[in-house]
Amino acid sequence: MTSAKVLYFSGEIPQGDPEGDQRTLFRKLHLLSKERDHVVLASLLECVTLTLKDECSKLSPQYRDLLPPFESVLDLTDHVVQLRKTPLGGAIERVLVLVFQLGSLVAYHEAHPLEYNFTPASTVIIGRGSGLLSAAAIGLSPSIVMVPSIAKEIARISFRFGLVVDKVCRSLEVSSDEINSDGAWVYCVHGIGEKEARDAVNQFNEIKAYPSTNGASVFNVDDAGNSVSIGGPPKTLEALFSESNIFKKTKNVAMRKIQGMWHTDRVYGPEHVEQIVPKIESARELHVPLISPVSGDPFRETEAGPLLEQIMEEILMERVRWDMIIETVSKQLKQLMPKSVQLVSIQPSHYNQNMLERWKSELPDAAVSGLTMMPAILELALEQSPPKDTRSSKIAVVGMSCRFPGSDTTEEFWERLMLGEDMHRHIPPDRFDVETHVDPTGKRHNTSKTSYGCFVDNPGLFDAMFFGMSPREAEQTDPMQRLALVTAYEALEKAGYVDGRGVIHRKRVGTFYGQASDDYREVNSGQEVGTYFIPGGCRAFGPGRINYFLNFWGPSFSVDTACSSSLAAIQAACSSLWSGDIDMAITGGMNILSNSDVYAGLSQGHFLSPTGGCKTWDEGADGYCRSDGVGSVVLKRLEDAEADNDNILAVVLSAATSHSAEAVSITHPHDAAQALLYNQIVRRAGIDPLEVGYVEMHGTGTQAGDPTEMRSVTSVFAPPHIQGSRPIPLHVGSVKANMGHGEAAAGIMAFVKTMLVFQNGIIPPHIGVKTGLNPALPDLDKAGVVIPFRAANWRPTGTKKRLAMVNNFGAAGGNTAMIIEEAKARPRLCEDIREAHAITISAKTAVSLSLNIKRLVEYIESAQDLSLADVAYTVSARRRHYEYRKSVVVRSLAEAIKHLQPHIETAKSQTPTLVKRPPVAFAFAGQGTFYVGIAAQIYRDSPFFRAQIDQFDNLARRQNFPSFLPAINKTCAHEDLPASSIHLAIVCVEVALARMCMTFGIKPCAVIGHSLGEYAALAVAEVLSDSDTVFLVGTRATILESNCSPYTHGMISVRASVDDISREADGLPFEVSCINGPNETVIGGTVENLEAVADRLSKVGYRKTRLDVPHAYHTAQMDNVVNELIRQSQGIAYNTPKIPIMSPRDSSVIETGANIDSSYLPTSLKKAVDFAGALNAAWEAGVVSKSTVWLELSHHPVCSGFINRTLPNTSLTCSTLHRDSDNWTSLLKTLSSLYEVGLNIDWNEYHRPFEHALRLVSAPTYAWNNKDYWIQYRGDWNLTKGQVLPEAELPAVSGFRTSSIHRLYSENYDSSTAHLLGECNMTDLSLKGVIEGHAMNGYGVASSFLHAEMAFTLARRIQEKASLSTFTGMGINVTNFEYHDPVVKDASSLDPYPIVVDAEANLEMGEVQIKWFNPAIEKWYCHAIAYYEDPSTWLSNWSRTTRLVTSRIDALVAMSNKGMANKLTTSLAYTLFGKLVDYSSMYHTMQWVILNEDEAVAEVVFPADTQGDWAVPPHFIDGVVSLSGFILNGGTHFDNVNNFFITPSWKSMRFAKPLAPGGRYLTYVRMIPEGVDDKGRLGSYVGDVYILQDGEIVGVVEAILFRQWPRIMLNRFFQPVGMAPPAPRVEKKRDAGRGTLPSSSSLQEKTTATAVTAKITARFPGSVITPSRSAPISKSGSSPKIVPQLDYSLLTPRTSPNSDERIEKTDSDSGFEEADGANDVTSRAVEILAEELAVDKGLLTDECEIADIGVDSLMSLVISQKLREDLGIEVRDAFYLEVTTIGDLKKLLS
């Protein structure tokens, strides 16, 4: 007997609400189709969807416009009711019936694949109406996988079937709306037979005289023959049942859900079949009988095409005889006589029950049952298999971090929410000045009407060194981008992300961040545009920098959709995960407010509340309150997160973004667009919207936005037609009421809040309603919507997961929303039975290490229900590790606290581990300390270790050795173990331990084995294969047992050297077996001999220990064993070692690649083990060193002591196992020690055997060593930009202009002080001759004497204007003059080159402080002090010196006359001077020079015209003073061929009488050495210059200093600003094809005279622009031009000099004062590096890694250019790729 199946497909859609019953099933089918076990279902839905879209594309426009957009055919379920009112209603319904039936059947049989066993002999298929099409699909599909392909064609037929029926029916009766709007086209009539019904219908049609097409017809007879179905136009049927006496008596039901009528040949014919059924190429045939509902017989056609045509003919034109179908099926069942009959149907129906009852009565011996697909599908469990593809995955949120107002952590953020805090406050001063930038009236230009916002505290705080950024780069990088980097890192820490761990690869990780403003770039860093202005401020660099720092290769997107930017970024991240582009995303948003313009613009646009915070849903809502915010979350596909053992905070089911395209304005919300979006994400998520329990609303607090959003939310999640029947209340909230509107960060704020709501099971109180609810909101009570004014519980209940929606809108019209589901709790699948755990903590600095320890201790102390194993797993396996480290091995949390607390302080002084990880040498012990149960616990718990051991044991047994597992798992006593088992256990355990350690990241640099341990060493060095190792060890042991009598010989370990033992043995026989250390020796021999030697040794006090071994290894007892072992091991192949092997046999090192003789191991059994000799040989060969870490792989530490005593400088020696300790604890202590010395332990591998028992805990994130990097917005230029302001161009003081001071910015006097600020334009025509006539290196130079003239000029101006009687007749002494960074002019440039001169006088002291500022290099470069003194006093003092000076002059003249000194003419003197200075004729004032080595006198005659308006003409000063320079640069006594000499300073310059035009003077000077440089060379010379007129000293320049410099430095000192220096003489090799850097002159902003004020004001904002008291009216007739009155304190150097150092000396100008830069290139290069990075030079040690201090590609460009310019050396622009540390850079430069 067999089993029979009857498959029944009705033509009905599910009964009840089509948006209820259908939607429930279709949601289930949608969710099932995402799973890997339901790929056929997914294929079916896809095929039908594609077919439907294809058919719809062929419709006329008026029909196409009736269809809503849809992603899947299932989406149309939401539109069934609306579509019924259109001509497409029937077509869509027919397709949905097909999907409903085939989808249910396919889904069920994918879950129960064995039940799809429909055989022709025992299966029959029946169907009604359009159900015949579904029946045909199954009949034509022998396999379930074949269903989708035929369903594609049948879906086309179904759709066309509906269209044709609608078209035909509308031709019979006009209907402008739903085809059934005027009545039903079909009635079901009970209590009447077919004949009676047909006669009555025919009679009625004749009486009414309808056209034949419009009459009624009987088309269906039920199985009992007493019910019929009658079809016809609604008006015809209405008349029939109201007028016919026969039908008035019957019970009839109008079938309003059936769209039109068919089964009548009065209106349908073959032409309609042709329109519906396409030509089908498929050659499929029925594989089971399909019964015709017309004839009751199987369809005559069996091939797909003809069969479908026949089916369509019967559906359209033939009457249904259901009674005949049932009769045929019953007859076949009776003939088959099955043991069971199963009726398989799609949905419950009275037909099902009728059939089952009949068969039960007719087949009493058969088990008759029914299987209904619909309830069976609804009962199928979800998530029983992984997603079928990435598109079907859920997205897990696994980590998050934030910087929100008042909240630096998510915990603080939650606390603020639960306390109901409103974080709005006045704009803090670090953003901009509220007093000037806020005007509540809005009348003032560019001001905001509101002063409120919600702000992150100290947004500039950042750990630049951690992220490898220089302070300079950090300062110029937008704080929101920095905080995005910080929060991304913290979120990854919370997620437990470690590169290379789990299923995520860094090449498939992307970043997505929302950012909608550029405040910092536009305002803060824009004030001082620098190297990092672009990468620090442009939006793309925000996510790009995260990718770069974390080494992620995936995409990085910066998203701007205005206020929805961050949620849109999260949605983009989800989409990228769903598309399979990436496997992990870091996403979020950022917003830091500092630009007053945005405040002003939003105020003017009426976005902002003038009264404070966001009043969401309040009747007085008046706009939003702006907010800072930066947040990051980490997303993965759910299956990946589960595989990685992540903490899953919540799960994103669906997310989408749309646009309010039909809103009244671009910024206005649109509820229809919002509702459409919600429906879309609900469908994608496959959820019932009524089960959503919480919606985090956008809720900005505006009168337009709040009601619109509430209407759209309630229309979907609490719709009017179900109000009051929601299964759960719908809570709504908005974080903006607490935190303000974060704009680009608003979405991430809402998202993080929702994560916390899920985590804590509480909905925080809503504080936005300050007065009363906005009356424009819908009736929330009626809708079941709850605004929680107090915290509301929302905890998990039952099996259903909580659902929430996060909503976010953008001001530009974008809408983003997502459905979020709570994460299910994952059970621990095993137990972690390890006794101890390592708590590892690391940092990049000692400060952070201390803070990390402190925070972890506080966390452990405060956390509840915390597991030590979880904490250890989190901080070791799930964290990154850095150079500063601490690790403690503990057995409890209390012990962890106890051991960690002391290190909070000690960590502050801890030194980092080496950048280069220490090498590790493996040592393998012999058998001396064997015990049963070695590595038993590791064998039990570690799959890797167990697999290794099992493989070795399998090899041993296959080579006929006994299993050695009993020696490990303690199933045998020690004395019962054969030697082969013991030896194999030892060696195999050691090799397995070594390999396990390698999986932990510990790779050996060399190996050494002691005795038996050499076999393990050679195996690890890959000299021996596993098989050969087992063979050699097993054979060796077997031969030992058979050739040596046990315990006739022995071994004794003695704490003495070989020489000591030999001396004390005094001829007694013994053999040296092992030399383990300098004073550690093992001797062997017969028992008798050993006892005699032992007695001798005991008497002299040597410690000795008898070893528990049965033989005397490495003695003559082994002779026979060695020979036999050599014989039996001839077939063993020794490979060349992959790493060096320290050989105790030969006291040598076997290098990598060396050949090893096959007798090596056999003979080592006889030879002494010189372990110490091997160690020393390795030390001498450099194979090991003091930095080498030693790891002993053994069952008990033996070799460790030998190593420590032989190599006492060894840094660390440790071992894996200890016989008296738990295996895991011993191993862990070793790993902990190795970790602390800098090895990168793979803690994931260590924890892998127990990971299913471990959970990631929310341990504290990294403690940053923050510093504040914030460029303050200075002044109020945001208010005035774009306005035409008066220019500062005219001289400030009427009539005051000299040849050196071209205008005064300001001039102020009071009773005791005076202050002048002036300008000297180096391109002014008045200076042309003076500067170009003093040329050096081919360029005109503003000499020190020109600066002296300016000092005389300003001091005289003050003297004249102060009008103090005490100054009358006073002379001016220019003292303490210092000149750095010479001002060099390019004669070809006509661009203005202004120099600012500042003079500040203390009139009571008679002192003027004068300093010069060069805007081109932004540096104070020169300084002097002028004193008002009595010239008569000078003359009196000088008179005492006159005789001495004149005597020296006379002596020189006499020497010249005798030819003992050189007398030079004017021409010759200036020709010689031309070696350094090319003087023009106006400087040629020396008439003759007498020169004798370091002493000279000259006659100077000045021209009759001063050629300008000067206080003291600079060329006159040069004429009388430059003799000092001529001695050095023009004579032959000093080396001025290779060097040059220039003056940076003098002590004083006084002229008691004016240097008069036409005057004749003598000048005398002697230059003497002034000390030596740091290399013992003469480096500077000093002299006093005397100026005499008519035998009287009238002027003295005291202590004028000249410094000696190599001539190669001329290019450095005398090069115009912005011009590239010529190529150096010797270049280092350059990269071929490397482009050259453009000269900075091409990039430098041209400076105009007017721009000086602007530049200084920009550099030192806060300067008050006020008219000078003497400001004149412009001669041009234009508006008065105001000269700025500057705040002089702001013109001081950034670092105020002390009293002894009045000018700003930087490393770049210290060349005149410091050691010779050309001879100390590397030192100067490091100084340049420190300058450009803005770091302390002390940080730049040789070990400092350049990446850690921020040397990247851009900074590398800057530094390389500076090295060219300042030092004349050539390095690659990308030198940062060639070096790692500062030490490397020094080597490169040297």
From Swiss-Prot:
Griseofulvin is a spirocyclic fungal natural product used in treatment of fungal dermatophytes. Residues 922-1223 are annotated as: Malonyl-CoA:ACP transacylase (MAT) domain. The modification O-(pantetheine 4'-phosphoryl)serine is found at S1753. Disruption phenotype: Impairs the production of griseofulvin. It is an enzyme of class 2 (transferase). The keyword Acyltransferase applies. Keywords: Acyltransferase, Phosphopantetheine, Phosphoprotein, Transferase. Residues 1298-1615 are annotated as: Product template (PT) domain. It comes from the Eukaryota. Pfam families: Acyl_transf_1, CurL-like_PKS_C, ketoacyl-synt, Ketoacyl-synt_C, PP-binding, SAT. Pathway: Secondary metabolite biosynthesis; terpenoid biosynthesis. Residues 1716-1790 form the Carrier domain. GO terms for molecular function: 3-oxoacyl-[acyl-carrier-protein] synthase activity; fatty acid synthase activity. One of its GO terms (biological process) is terpenoid biosynthetic process. Residues 1302-1611 form the PKS/mFAS DH domain. It catalyses: 6 malonyl-CoA + acetyl-CoA + 4 H(+) = 2-(2,4-dihydroxy-6-oxidobenzoyl)-5-hydroxy-3-methylbenzenolate + 6 CO2 + 7 CoA + H2O. Residues 392-822 form the Ketosynthase family 3 (KS3) domain. InterPro entries: Ac_transferase_dom_sf, ACP-like_sf, Acyl_transferase_dom, Acyl_Trfase/lysoPLipase, Ketoacyl_synth_AS, Ketoacyl_synth_C, Ketoacyl_synth_N, Malonyl_transacylase_ACP-bd. Its EC number is 2.3.1.-. Multidomain protein; including a starter unit:ACP transacylase (SAT) that selects the starter unit; a ketosynthase (KS) that catalyzes repeated decarboxylative condensation to elongate the polyketide backbone; a malonyl-CoA:ACP transacylase (MAT) that selects and transfers the extender unit malonyl-CoA; a product template (PT) domain that controls the immediate cyclization regioselectivity of the reactive polyketide backbone; and an acyl-carrier protein (ACP) that serves as the tether of the growing and completed polyketide via its phosphopantetheinyl arm. NCBIfam families: PT_fungal_PKS. This is Non-reducing polyketide synthase gsfA. It comes from Penicillium aethiopicum. The lineage of its organism: Eukaryota, Fungi, Dikarya, Ascomycota, Pezizomycotina. The gene is gsfA.
